[in-house]
Structure formats: structure tokens, C-alpha cells
UniProtKB/Swiss-Prot annotation:
GTP 2 binds at residues 181-188, 229-233, 294-297. It comes from the Bacteria. GO terms for biological process: ribosome biogenesis. This is GTPase Der. HAMAP family: GTPase_Der. CDD domains: EngA1, EngA2. It comes from Streptococcus gordonii (strain Challis / ATCC 35105 / BCRC 15272 / CH1 / DL1 / V288). The gene is der. One of its GO terms (molecular function) is ribosome binding. GTPase that plays an essential role in the late steps of ribosome biogenesis. Signal peptide: none annotated. Residues 4-167, 175-351 form the EngA-type G domain. Keywords: GTP-binding, Nucleotide-binding, Repeat, Ribosome biogenesis.
Length: 436
């Protein structure tokens, strides 16, 4: 069972994301003084008075025909449906607007606890203005200045008072994974296809998913996953909007939070130079990796198409030789059912521990096949090896002189270890260290 859920809703530019970030304690939602900059539901976990809960930020709702508005309304309705408590944010500076009344009518139908937060009450003189908001018929208004942190404690007190009694601890066996890739490779459509729900705004306009969005789901075997959809990354020279700049930073954070990363390629466009750069971020972070070629249904194929693609990927992503490749279609759901098992297998590989005795047998067998190198008449001696970490599996090899361990021989030892043990989808690190 998930944690209790709080949805933050309201019209555009009333400070929902600022309040969300104040409660979450970090800058998760993109906040700018531009209407409509938060378009999707954004999730975070918060706690207050020893109660832990999830909070959802939503795009601004308005009764107008603005771009994306129907999708934003639909997303907000899903968020309200998921929520145990709803925080309705209005602006004390502007008073009640037609859009506020439109949102209030939506909230009447939910029959859920509503906390009315009157934001932008930045000084004591403005407190008298909040009484007008009783006219919305949603109970006592709470004066708040989310920018300055004034009144947020009262809102949190009210949230906790209305939470359901059950509180469930997080699952320590949860596997976290993210989808990374350039804009418009189909990451959001993949999420929607996997979940069977319009979880994020999926649009053919590149870059329509701006934030990293967490979604929890369980497979048929009871394994829980947290899926993080990241904003598409773009070359620095092509990032013009501040929001895009924030999104690249957030994508890096999403990779950092992940156990496994799905590197999504677009079959229609082929492999781009920047795809390799993006994948390099995950590789350097030591994450498990699956290379996902999306939009496979759009290609005209023959008996060699898949093999040709695999060969090209192996050539272009030489540093990802350990990463499995899967060809999928978010539209037709082709092969998507295989992804959870692949992610689980990679997670197991990341957490594999090899007993030192078994590891050293493999190392000695490797030396018998290919003796250690020499340099200026001095031979590399390997005394023993031991595993020192997981996620990724990391091994220290104790030697007589670190300088004698050539990169090529270290790669040879890595290949022998991979042959002996299952490390599919995860990098492994080998470190040569002089024995003292």
C-alpha cells in the first residue's frame, strides 16, 4: 500500500509549486514567474509530526482553451482521484477569480478533505483579505506565504489531521529506475504504455515533459518499482529556456537516484552523437543500463534489420558492451512486458557478492590463460582480489606495483570475471592497489 497522498491544485500562477517545494524541502517543481510552467503531476515524499506522506504538484487549471489545458485538467483530475487530502491554492493578492470558482466546482465533486491555502499573504495587513475566500464554500482559509515559509506549518497541521490512519513503511526492496534520452524519443509514451494510465503528458512536441516524475507500480510477482521519467536532455548550445536548464540538472539527479537506467533511442531517427553522451552519464555513475530502442513499429524491416541495429549500437556504444538491448514500441506495446524482468535481473546483478575464494580462483585461472604483463623486465604480480562494494560490483586487486597493471590487462580480467559470473546490465569496477 502506498503512503497517504496529498494533491496540490489551483489555477495557474498562484504559487502551487512554491508551496510544494516548501513542503518537500527541495526544488523539485520548476518554478518561474510564467503562467503554466508546471504541466504534469510532480511527486515527492514529505513528513510532518512523524507522519510521512506523498505530495503531488499539478499544472494550473483554467476554464480556457489554452495549449495543453485539456490534458492538464485530465492530469489534475487523476491527481485528485489519487489523493487522500487536497490542498487548494488561491492568491490573496488577486482575490477570487472565475478560474478559482471553476476549480472549486471540480473539488465539490471529490467529496474529499479540502485545505484552502490563500497564498501570497506576504504581510500582516493582507490577512484581512482572506475572509473573502469563505465565499468558495470550502471551509476555513489558511493565510500562507510559501515564498517566506509563513503559514505553511498550519497547512501541514491541517493535512496531518485529515490523513487516513494507516501509514505504511517504504519497501526496502524497491527497485528504482529512470528513463533517459533526448526529447521526443518516446519516454513518456513508454511510461504510459507500461502503466496503462496517462501518467504524464505525452505529446509529439519535443520537450513536453519537463520534470522528473516518480511513479510506483508492482509487477505480477509482487516486485515494487519506482519509475522516474526524466526531461529530455539537449545539447548545451540548444538550451534556450531556463526551464530546460533546470530539467537537465534534474535528469542528472534522477540518474543518481536510480538503480537501473533505461537509455531510450528513437528508431525513426537512429543514433545521435548526443545519445552516447547521455548514456555516458549513466555509465560513469555506475548504474545498471538497458538500451531501449523505441518506435520499432515505425520501421520497414527485413531479416537483417535487428542484427544491423544491434551491431551499430555495439559499435557506437562500445563502453556499454554489458548492456542488454531491447526493441520496443510504446504504441503497440511490443516487448514491453519483458522490461520488468530485465530490470529485476540487472538489479540482482548489481547486488551480487562473490566470495573471495571463488573470485581468486577465477583470477588465477585468468592468469594461467594470459600471464601478467611485464614492463622493463619487471612482471606484474597479483596477490589476491576481494569484492569491496555492490551497486556497482567493485573489486580491489592487490598487486606488487599499481603502474604495472595496464588498462588492457584490467579489461581482460573484467571479461574473465563476467564470463564466470552473471553481471548482465551492470558495469563492474576493478581497482589495482599496491599491497602494503
Amino acid at each position: 500500500m502506498a503512503l497517504p497522498t496529498i494533491a496540490i491544485v489551483g489555477r495557474p500562477n498562484v504559487g502551487k509549486s512554491t508551496l510544494f517545494n516548501r513542503i518537500a524541502g527541495e526544488r523539485i517543481s520548476i518554478v518561474e514567474d510564467v503562467e503554466g510552467v508546471t504541466r504534469d503531476r510532480i511527486y515527492a515524499t514529505a513528513d510532518w509530526l512523524n507522519r510521512k506522506f506523498s505530495i503531488i504538484d499539478t499544472g494550473g487549471i483554467d476554464d480556457v482553451d489554452a495549449p495543453f489545458m485539456e490534458q492538464i485538467k485530465h492530469q489534475a483530475e487523476i491527481a485528485m482521484d489519487e489523493a487522500d487530502v487536497i490542498v487548494f491554492v488561491v492568491s490573496g493578492k488577486e482575490g477570487i477569480t472565475d478560474a478559482d470558482e471553476y476549480v472549486a466546482r471540480m473539488l465539490y465533486k471529490t467529496h474529499k478533505p479540502i485545505i484552502l491555502a490563500v497564498n501570497k499573504v506576504d504581510n500582516p495587513e493582507m490577512r484581512n483579505e482572506i475572509f473573502d475566500f469563505y465565499a468558495l464554500g470550502l471551509g476555513d482559509p489558511f493565510p500562507v506565504s510559501s515564498v517566506h515559509g509563513i503559514g505553511t506549518g498550519d497547512v501541514l497541521d491541517a493535512i496531518v489531521e485529515n490523513l487516513p490512519n494507516e501509514e505504511v513503511a517504504e519497501n526496502p526492496d524497491m527497485i528504482k529506475f529512470s528513463l533517459i534520452g533526448r526529447p521526443n524519443v518516446g519516454k513518456s509514451s513508454l511510461i504510459n504504455a507500461i502503466l496503462g494510465e496517462e501518467r504524464v503528458i505525452a505529446s509529439p512536441v519535443a520537450g513536453t515533459t519537463r520534470d522528473a516524475i516518480d511513479t510506483v507500480f508492482t509487477d505480477s510477482e509482487g516486485q515494487e518499482f519506482t519509475m522516474i521519467d526524466t526531461a529530455g536532455m539537449r545539447k548545451s548550445g540548444k538550451v534556450y529556456e531556463n526551464t530546460e536548464k533546470y530539467s537537465v540538472m534534474r535528469a542528472m539527479r534522477a540518474i543518481d537516484r536510480s538503480d537501473v537506467v533505461l537509455m531510450v533511442l528513437n528508431a525513426e531517427e537512429g543514433i545521435r552523437e548526443y545519445d552516447k553522451r547521455i548514456a555516458g552519464f549513466a555509465h560513469e555513475a555506475g548504474k545498471g543500463i538497458v538500451i531501449v530502442v523505441n518506435k520499432w513499429d515505425t520501421l520497414e524491416k527485413d531479416n537483417h534489420t535487428m542484427k544491423d541495429w544491434e551491431a551499430d549500437i555495439r559499435d557506437q556504444f562500445q563502453y556499454l558492451s554489458y548492456a542488454p538491448i531491447i526493441f520496443v514500441s510504446a504504441l503497440t506495446k511490443q516487448r514491453l512486458h519483458k522490461l520488468p524482468d530485465m530490470i529485476k535481473q540487472i538489479s540482482q546483478s548489481q547486488n551480487t557478492r562473490i566470495p573471495s575464494a571463488v573470485l581468486n580462483d577465477v583470477i588465477m585461472d585468468a592468469i594461467a590463460i594470459n600471464p601478467t604483463p611485464t614492463d622493463k623486465g619487471k612482471r606484474l604480480k597479483i596477490f589476491y582480489a576481494t569484492q569491496v562494494a555492490t551497486k556497482p560490483p567493485t573489486f580491489v586487486i592487490f598487486v606488487n606495483e599499481e603502474e604495472l597493471m595496464h588498462f588492457s590487462y584490467l579489461r581482460f580480467l573484467e571479461n574473465q570475471i563476467r564470463k564466470a559470473f552473471v553481471f548482465e546490465g551492470t558495469p563492474i569496477h576493478l581497482i589495482a592497489r599496491k599491497r602494503k
